[in-house]
Structure formats: structure tokens, C-alpha cells
Curated annotation (Swiss-Prot):
Function, in words: HflC and HflK could encode or regulate a protease.
Organism: Buchnera aphidicola subsp. Acyrthosiphon pisum (strain APS) (Acyrthosiphon pisum symbiotic bacterium)
Subunit structure and binding partners: HflC and HflK may interact to form a multimeric complex.
InterPro entries noted in UniProt: Band7/mec-2_domain, Band_7, Band_7/SPFH_dom_sf, HflK
Chief place of localization: membrane
Annotated segments matching region Disordered: 1-29
Pfam families: Band_7
Name the record gives this protein: Protein HflK
């Protein structure tokens, strides 16, 4: 305690030390030893207090800095983890550093420093469509309504994002301008009928030439020319014209099909006629040569027996001429008004399957015309019922003879 501390050789203020001053003075040596021991204790005590104060101050500073370090570590961890991102297979990432284009990233897991870099994924595989339509003026000063669909995709993401502010709107304006230019240089019939394919290809070329200087990062895949129709006021007349044109095309196709069907037949028939003509020519030539040879053989006989040869030639000629003609037999000894057809006569007689000449030779003695017999009817096929009809026919025949004589 403080009263136990010595103070510049001053008397000791220990309350227990004044009880017996004599005893204190008597034992000075003993008190000197105790004072030395107390000084060591005081020194150790004071050192302990100093150390204790320093320890308390360091602990208080540690208590202040430890939570702040944890907060900083967690913040850095969250910042680092939040920088990871994924780009899909159909996309490409456009990285900007403080708003300026930096580079492109490929599909997969990537990392960026948050708050410093930004990533904008752009789909480069999807085919996008842009539809446009409108009423336009043609080259022949007609009005037509046209609808068109444009298919495109992004091939350069950086140009698509940074070259033009609104690339889709710019493409729409370029499409409208190109379509109006092509329609303005085409006639209405061409737009509505056979010129649709040409209008489509010309429009695609015009769109590509328009967007090329702007480097929009877009590639035109296809242009579909959907519909083109006239105004409603004249639609009926144009429908009739289109129907007539389609009918004409149908008739042309039918004519071509008929031509393809008839031509082979005609060619075959012509070839057959040529072959028949050649064979006929050969046959006639051979027949003429045969006649010449026959007359050459007959000539010596003609010189020997002129009358007989002439009569034989006459009979053969008449036989050849009358073989296929209708023949009428007339009996000049009786009434000339009665006549009958030899064809009808021989059709009633059963002639065997032999030559007609042989049949006549065999039956010439049995012919009813060889003998004149009274009350013999030479025309058994004529009945009394048809005599009047036969007379009418004979009168017509007589009239014909008179007309021939006149």
C-alpha cells in the first residue's frame, strides 16, 4: 500500500509501525531486510500493471479491426463469384470495358470483373424475320398492294450492336425502299403474274446493296414475295384476266400433250404409208414387167392366129372386168321387159365349193335355157305378186336407156 512506500528517508507512516518505536529502533537491521523485499514486490507489481495496460490496448484494437477484415473478405468473394457468367451455344458475348467494345467471348463459362466490364449476349444462330407491306405505284401507273417477308440472321455481333443505333428498324426502312424501287420499275402484269420471281431476286439484291455500306452485321438469307394483289375496285377484272391467262396456259399444255401423243402415231403412219408405197411401186413394176413378158410371149401366137388370139384376150379382159360387177341377164327371145339378176339367180342355186367355170361346164347341158319348151318359166324366182314391182323397175330401166340414147 502507499503508506508502506518509503519517501526520501521520511518516517514511515505505517500505523502499525508506531506502536513500539523502541523496538523499531532496536531492530534496524531486521527492518532493512524487509524493506528490500517489499521494493522487489512493488517493482513486480508495477511491471505487471504496465504489461496489463499494454495488453488491454492491443486487445481493444484487435476487437475493432477483426470485423472489418471479415466484411472486406466477404465483399471480395461476392464480387469475384458474381463475375462468372455463361454464354449458350447459339450466342456470342460482346464485352465492353467502361462502355467501349473490348472483345468477343465464345460459348461456355467465362468471367468478367464486375463494375468494370459488361457482357451483352447476342444470338447468332436464330433466323429472324421482318415483314413489310404497302400500297405501291407500278411503272404503268397502276396501284398494287404488296406483302414481303425478309429472313436474316446476325453474323457480326459487334457491328450489330455498335455500327447502327437501331439495326432492325434500319433494315425495315431499307427493305421498304428497295421494294418500292423494284415495284416502281415493274409493270402490274409482271408483278401479279410471271414476274414475281424476278421481283423477289431484284429486291433481295437491292436490300443487300443498301445495307452493305452501313456494316450492320446482318446477312440476308431469303426474301419471300408473299402476295401481290390489285385494289378492290378492279380486283374482279384482274381476276378474270388471270383466269384467262391460266386457261390459255392450260390449253397450251393440253395441246402439247396431244401433240406428243399424236406425233408418234403420225410418224408411224407416215412410215407405214411410205413402206406401202414402196411395196406398191415394186408390185406395179413387177406386174408391168410380167405383162410385158406375157405380151412378148403372146406376140408370136398373135402373128400366127390373129383372130383367135384377139378373141381370147377379149374374153380374158371381160372376165377380169366383170368378175366383181353386178350382172343382169336378159332373154331377147321373150318379152324384153322381164329381166333378172344373175347374182340373185345363182344365190338360190346351191353351188359346191368349186370353180364357177367348172360348174357351168358340167351343168351346161342341164340348163333350162338350152331348150325352148312351151310353158316353161325361165324365172322361177319371180312370183305373180311382185310382177307389178318388176315392171316398174323395167320401166325405169327403159327410161334410163332413152335418156342415154338422147
Amino acid at each position: 500500500m502507499v503508506w508502506n512506500k518509503p519517501n526520501n528517508n521520511k518516517p514511515d507512516f505505517d500505523p502499525w509501525g508506531n506502536k513500539d518505536s523502541k523496538s523499531k529502533n532496536c531492530s534496524d537491521n531486521k527492518h532493512e531486510k524487509k524493506t528490500t523485499v517489499l521494493d522487489i514486490k512493488n517493482f513486480l507489481y508495477n511491471l505487471k500493471n504496465i504489461i496489463t495496460k499494454k495488453t488491454d490496448s492491443s486487445n481493444s484494437s484487435k476487437k475493432i479491426t477483426y470485423p472489418f477484415s471479415i466484411i472486406i473478405f466477404i465483399s471480395f468473394f461476392i464480387w469475384g463469384v458474381s463475375g462468372f457468367y455463361t454464354i449458350t451455344e447459339a450466342e456470342r458475348g460482346v464485352v465492353t470495358s467502361f462502355g467501349k467494345f473490348s472483345h468477343l467471348v465464345q460459348p461456355g463459362l467465362n468471367w468478367r470483373p464486375v463494375f468494370f466490364n459488361e457482357v451483352k449476349p447476342v444470338n447468332v444462330e436464330t433466323v429472324r424475320e421482318l415483314a413489310t407491306s404497302g400500297i405501291m405505284l407500278t411503272a404503268d401507273e397502276n396501284v398494287v398492294r404488296v406483302e414481303m417477308n425478309v429472313q436474316y440472321k446476325i453474323t457480326n455481333p459487334a457491328d450489330y450492336l455498335f455500327s447502327v443505333c437501331y439495326p432492325d428498324d434500319s433494315l425495315r426502312q431499307a427493305t421498304d425502299s428497295a421494294l418500292r424501287g423494284v415495284i416502281g420499275h415493274s409493270t402490274m402484269d409482271r408483278v401479279l403474274t410471271e414476274g414475281r420471281t424476278l421481283v423477289r431476286s431484284d429486291t433481295q439484291k437491292e436490300i443487300e446493296n443498301t445495307i452493305k455500306p452501313y456494316k450492320m452485321g446482318i446477312t440476308i438469307l431469303d426474301v419471300n414475295f408473299q402476295t401481290a394483289r390489285p385494289p378492290e375496285e378492279v380486283k374482279a377484272a384482274f381476276d378474270d384476266a388471270i383466269a384467262a391467262r391460266e386457261n390459255r396456259e392450260q390449253y397450251v399444255r393440253e395441246a402439247e400433250a396431244y401433240s406428243n401423243e399424236v406425233k408418234p402415231k403420225a410418224n408411224g403412219k407416215a412410215q407405214r404409208i411410205l413402206e406401202e408405197a414402196k411395196s406398191y411401186s415394186s408390185r406395179i413394176i413387177l406386174q408391168a414387167q410380167g405383162e410385158v413378158a406375157r405380151f412378148s410371149k403372146i406376140l408370136p401366137e398373135y402373128r400366127i392366129a390373129k383372130k383367135i388370139t384377139l378373141k381370147r384376150l377379149y374374153i380374158e379382159s371381160m372376165e377380169r372386168l366383170l368378175r366383181k360387177n353386178k350382172k343382169i341377164f336378159i332373154d331377147t327371145n321373150n318379152n324384153p321387159m322381164f329381166f333378172f339378176s344373175l347374182d340373185n339367180f345363182f344365190s338360190k342355186i346351191k353351188i359346191p365349193n368349186k370353180n364357177f367355170k367348172d360348174h357351168i361346164k358340167i351343168n351346161k347341158n342341164h340348163s333350162p335355157f338350152n331348150k325352148k319348151v312351151k310353158n316353161t318359166n325361165y324365172f322361177p324366182f319371180l312370183s305373180p305378186d311382185n310382177i307389178s314391182e318388176q315392171r316398174r323397175i323395167n320401166s325405169i330401166r327403159s327410161d334410163l336407156k332413152k335418156i342415154g340414147r338422147e
